[in-house]
């Protein structure tokens, strides 16, 4: 009996060794390096467009005595630039798509967050906390198409993201509402925080190309050398007067209560 148990244990150990040597890196596990970065806007903070919400008195009432602006440039101390999408370019081993949905909220007649990241195949979960109805409308070039009304205190809207792109989401009822979803095919992405920082963990070692994207200033890329178990730092800077690159989206909100005019550059 003892001999049989020993053989069984040896077989189990052998199988575990084979599995460990054939499996690729998995997000959330060790073996990779960490990329820590900072995104800055190097100049005076641009003036964000003023939003006129008179077309919906219920939205307008939320901002009595205030001057709401579009959160196009969210710049903090030392030029820290928030809401910049960060992702790694290239091909990576398959990893499980999270079963937890990414959440886009409608609150105070604005989308929140302004920019978020998600995996292809992940579920988008849109909620409405406002005292008014919304119409959630995607402007997709890759088949992530939806256009649906969401009533006051209505059930969440859910959609399984199908393809990679930077997806712009608007509201047909409130033309000033905009959000961007960076849909990617790997787990190595982030969005810069209020202090301009971002972190991507468990990155496979080797040369990696980092792409950042801002809705007005467009994309930038840098290549870094990631080492297992170590931290790699990288900084990105946008300059005043820099010509927006392909992929930037320009918005112009004019002082009119009925409609907002947008100029959208091709992505």
Stretches found by the model and what they are:
Residues 1-4:
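Positively charged n-region of N-terminal signal peptides that target proteins for export
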Residues 6-7, 262:
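Intrinsically disordered, low-complexity segments enriched in glycine/proline and serine/threonine
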């Amino acid at each position: 009996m003892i001999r049989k148990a020993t053989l069984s244990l040896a077989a189990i150990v052998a199988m575990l060794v084979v599995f460990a040597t054939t499996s690729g890196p998995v997000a959330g596990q060790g073996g990779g390096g960490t990329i820590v970065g900072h995104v800055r806007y190097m100049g005076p903070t641009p003036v964000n467009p003023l939003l006129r919400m008179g077309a919906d008195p219920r939205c307008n009432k939320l901002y009595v005595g205030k001057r709401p602006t579009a959160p196009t440039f969210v710049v903090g101390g030392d030029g820290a630039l928030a809401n910049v999408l960060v992702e790694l370019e290239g091909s990576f081993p398959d990893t499980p798509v999270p079963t937890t949905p990414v959440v886009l909220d409608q609150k105070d007649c604005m989308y929140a967050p302004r920019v978020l990241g998600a995996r292809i195949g992940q579920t988008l979960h849109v909620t409405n906390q406002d005292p008014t109805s919304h119409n959630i409308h995607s402007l997709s070039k890759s088949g992530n198409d939806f256009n649906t009304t969401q009533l006051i205190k209505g059930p969440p809207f859910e959609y399984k993201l199908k393809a990679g792109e930077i997806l712009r989401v608007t509201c047909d009822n409130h033309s000033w509402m905009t959000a961007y979803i960076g849909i990617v095919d790997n787990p190595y992405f982030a969005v810069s925080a209020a202090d301009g920082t971002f972190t991507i963990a468990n990155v496979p070692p080797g040369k990696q190309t980092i792409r950042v994207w801002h809705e007005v200033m467009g994309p930038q890329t840098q290549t870094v050398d990631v080492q297992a178990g170590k931290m790699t730092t990288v900084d990105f800077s946008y300059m005043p007067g820099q010509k927006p690159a392909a992929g930037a989206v320009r918005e112009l909100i004019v002082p009119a209560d009925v409609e907002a005019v947008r100029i959208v550059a091709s992505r």
